[in-house]
């Protein structure tokens, strides 16, 4: 990316950050740092810490992007919501998502992906979520994690962060892996959902009414989602 710094300035950027001194010129708008990626993440965390609003972190083996879109859509009916665009969910996409949050935002929904152990730990320390949701933990894409246990440990880094910071998780109690992961981490505040023994109940669908319905505190919410 260093080689494109001058091109970016010529196209109107106010400043360009580089981490290779050989690209420096007398141009006063070039800023030299030790590591551009680290600087991006540090700037993103600083910006996030200026925002006293709820941050929802979402990860999981499958369904991250769909879940993020659904959560953001529902919340936007009442709040000004900023959320990850597309699947910008990695070590570059998450900081860019945070840096694009405007001061009038009321809730942020941040998708976080992982392909290796430690990825989620890195991202939560940038995004600083106070709410979290793991959609599931599966055996897809095992190559980067080494084993299913590696997947659970990596996704569980979101729970680890929320445990350490007294955060809240939205927990599918019908998923035994997720249930145990939360149960093994005392101090997390879970809000449960599922088809039984939960605070938010997913109601059965029928052939003549195949749309997803949920029950919250005695109130039934009808959706246009096919269950």
Predicted feature residues:
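Short polar/acidic secondary-structure junctions
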Residues: 22-23, 48, 114, 207, ...
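Adenine nucleotide phosphate-binding catalytic loops in nucleotide-utilizing enzymes
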Residues: 28, 148-149, 184-227
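Intrinsic-disorder/low-complexity, polar/charged segments
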Residues: 20, 35, 90, 175, ...
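Short, polar loop motifs at secondary-structure junctions
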Residues: 16-23, 173-177, 195-197
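A short acidic, often aromatic-flanked loop/helix-cap motif at beta-alpha or helix-coil junctions
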Residues: 24, 36-40, 90, 196-201
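Phosphate-binding loop of NTP-binding sites
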Residues: 32, 38-173, 177-186, 217
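N-terminal leader/targeting and accessory segments in enzymes
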Residues: 1-42
């Amino acid at each position: 990316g260093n080689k494109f710094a001058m091109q970016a300035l010529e196209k109107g950027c106010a400043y360009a950050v580089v981490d290779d001194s050989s690209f420096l010129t007398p141009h006063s708008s070039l800023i030299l740092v030790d590591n551009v990626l680290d600087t991006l993440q540090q700037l993103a965390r600083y910006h996030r810490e200026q925002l006293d609003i709820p941050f929802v972190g979402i990860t999981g083996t499958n369904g991250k992007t769909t879940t993020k879109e659904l959560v953001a859509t529902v919340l936007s009916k009442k709040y000004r919501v900023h959320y990850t665009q597309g699947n910008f969910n990695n070590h570059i996409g998450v900081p860019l998502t945070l840096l694009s949050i405007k001061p009038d935002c009321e809730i942020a929904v941040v998708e976080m992906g992982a392909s290796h152990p430690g990825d989620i730990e890195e991202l939560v320390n940038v995004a600083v979520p106070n709410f979290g949701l793991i959609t599931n933990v599966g055996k897809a894409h095992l190559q980067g994690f080494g084993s299913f246990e590696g997947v659970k440990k990596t996704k569980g880094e979101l729970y680890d962060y929320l445990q350490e910071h007294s955060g809240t998780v939205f927990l599918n109690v019908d998923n035994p892996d997720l249930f145990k992961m939360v149960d093994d981490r005392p101090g997390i505040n879970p809000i449960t959902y599922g088809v039984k023994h939960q605070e938010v109940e997913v109601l059965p669908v029928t052939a003549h009414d195949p749309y997803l319905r949920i029950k919250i505190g005695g109130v039934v919410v009808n959706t246009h989602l096919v269950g």
